[in-house]
């Protein structure tokens, strides 16, 4: 392969690197370069690598408009992201960043839609051929967007699981298994009186899928193990009241599962004022553990893996026939110093 020392070529035009320049540098035809960029035909790995190396060496940037006309694609996907008062934005942004990162690896950009646009937002981007597909977050059990997604001729993936999953492609953490894993962990340690401090009341009122599934797993596992269990919705500003209520109504409580990252700190502070601190009060968390606090037993929220899976599934649907189904990632519980056998 001959060296090209400059982005400027003597073809009588300006100095912009063109697809013909990449083809000449890589020793292939311009159509082969196009196929590598579009993925429309199978190209050998060695040729694909040579073309990619030439693209990088020359600094070639495909023209988005021309590429879209040629492939009938926008090379953009939409992400419907929840931005509302009861959503913990740092967690939502972890999913968003993972989707953007994975999309760029597939040569796609991401158009953000807010939850408030609802079904009309989906119709707008589909009707205007603005995107090649859409990923929807914060899915409710009876989500108004689901019938629209079924009706639109637009590939889609849900990060979350509604009640009716027919003809849908969904991916998420198995939150029911996560709730159950925490119960079994505490029961194995000998706890018989536990509580789940969950999401804000509004999350349950609108029947958000991940929250409902966590409660289901929690309650079924508690019944299976013969453990006394209760649910308390919570938000950071009600955490003290929730702690005081549990201490008053459940004096025998020895285990706590927290599915609400912003409330972890206020809850631990409130219990500590009454002399209840881990591991005397065993505490496990579902989701990210706030920095700076005690090391908590927890089930991690694999936002990066979920986002990457969602993008991969969407690209499969964009490139070929749909294969609907539900993918649930197995929860991984890490035991730390915050849980122990009751005294």
List PLM regions with ranges.
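Structural motif
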Residues: 108-128, 230-249
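Flexible loop/hinge segments that line or gate small-molecule binding clefts
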Residues: 137-177, 181, 199-202, 286-297
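N-terminal helix-turn-helix DNA-binding module of bacterial transcription factors
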Residues: 1-75, 343
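Hydrophobic alpha-helical segments within soluble ligand-binding/sensing domains
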Residues: 171-197, 237-245, 301-319
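Amphipathic helical "hinge" segments at domain boundaries
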Residues: 45, 53, 60-123, 133, ...
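Short beta-strand segments enriched in small/hydrophobic residues
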Residues: 32-35, 72-85, 193-201
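An alpha-beta-alpha
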Residues: 182-229, 323-340
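Flexible loop/turn connectors
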Residues: 249-343
């Amino acid at each position: 392969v001959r060296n090209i020392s400059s982005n400027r070529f003597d073809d009588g035009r300006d100095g912009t690197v063109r697809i013909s320049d990449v083809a000449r540098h890589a020793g292939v035809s311009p159509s082969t370069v196009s196929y590598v960029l579009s993925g429309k035909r199978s190209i050998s790995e060695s040729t694909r690598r040579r073309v990619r190396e030439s693209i990088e060496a020359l600094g070639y940037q495909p023209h988005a408009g021309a590429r879209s006309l040629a492939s009938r694609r926008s090379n953009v996907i939409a992400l419907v992201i929840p931005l509302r008062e009861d959503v913990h934005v740092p967690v939502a942004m972890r999913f968003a960043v993972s989707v953007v990162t994975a999309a760029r690896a597939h040569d796609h950009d991401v158009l953000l839609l807010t939850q408030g646009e609802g079904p009309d937002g989906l119709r707008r981007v589909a009707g205007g051929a603005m995107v090649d597909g859409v990923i929807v977050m914060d899915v409710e059990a009876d989500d108004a967007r689901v019938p629209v997604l079924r009706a639109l001729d637009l590939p889609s993936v849900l990060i979350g699981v509604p009640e009716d999953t027919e003809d849908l492609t969904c991916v998420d953490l198995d939150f029911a298994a996560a709730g159950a894993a925490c119960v079994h962990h505490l029961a194995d340690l000998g706890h018989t009186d536990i509580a789940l401090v969950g999401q804000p009341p509004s999350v349950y009122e609108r029947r958000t899928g991940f929250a409902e599934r966590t409660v289901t797993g929690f309650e079924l596992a508690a019944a299976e193990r013969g453990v006394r269990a209760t649910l308390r919705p919570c938000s950071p500003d009600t955490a003290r009241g929730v702690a005081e209520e549990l201490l008053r109504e459940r004096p025998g409580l020895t285990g706590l599962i927290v599915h609400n990252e912003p409330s972890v700190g206020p809850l631990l502070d409130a219990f500590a004022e009454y002399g209840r601190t881990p591991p005397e009060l065993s505490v496990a968390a579902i989701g990210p553990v706030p920095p700076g606090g005690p090391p908590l037993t927890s089930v991690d929220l694999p936002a990066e893996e979920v986002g990457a899976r969602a993008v991969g599934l969407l690209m499969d649907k964009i490139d070929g026939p749909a294969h609907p189904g539900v993918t649930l990632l197995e929860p991984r519980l890490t035991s730390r110093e915050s849980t122990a056998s009751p005294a």
